[in-house]
Amino acid sequence: NEIISQHLLNGVLSDNGYFQHIRKDKFFSLYIAYLLIKYGGDPNFSRNLMFCNNTLQTEKMFALALGRLESRADGKILCSYIYDKEKNEIGDFHSGMFFRETTSIKGVKISVFFKIDEEKGMINISFRSTDDIDVSKAANFFGGGGHKVAAGAHIRGEFSEVKEKTLKLLEDLLRDPDSISS
């Protein structure tokens, strides 16, 4: 029915970045999207849900994250962070917004986002990359997981140390993709 088709279409479109990561030899999700639209799913509804649904608080958190943007490896790596307490004060923030913007910047190969929970001593690391860099290797190194272009890990530690270790690992990954085993 239309409701189920819509929910499934939302998932397909969200999972592959609204077709930003489609390879010409792997187009099955395009066919699935076609079928879901045929059975009543509305891609415009999905787009509005994903891209036109932010609150003022979300935009303020996004501005904070962009204001902290840091570049490494001649602009090939971008990173930023937010603290859990900031989320509680300003409002929630979905890192997908951050990744949509940072991965669209010319020359960027890897974007990394840190969510820091100082109270629990935990840091959530999220990675995104272009198709030629396998960030799941970095996530696996920290005990996390994911797939080639989107991965993450939870790690205990002091933020400045975790950040430097992460960025060094990503610089190594850029220089030699085989330097980190997956």
Regions found by a protein language model. Give the residues of each.
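Hydrophobic helix-and-loop "lid/oligomerization" segment in the mid-to-C-terminal part
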Residues: I3-L9, L13-F141, G146-S182
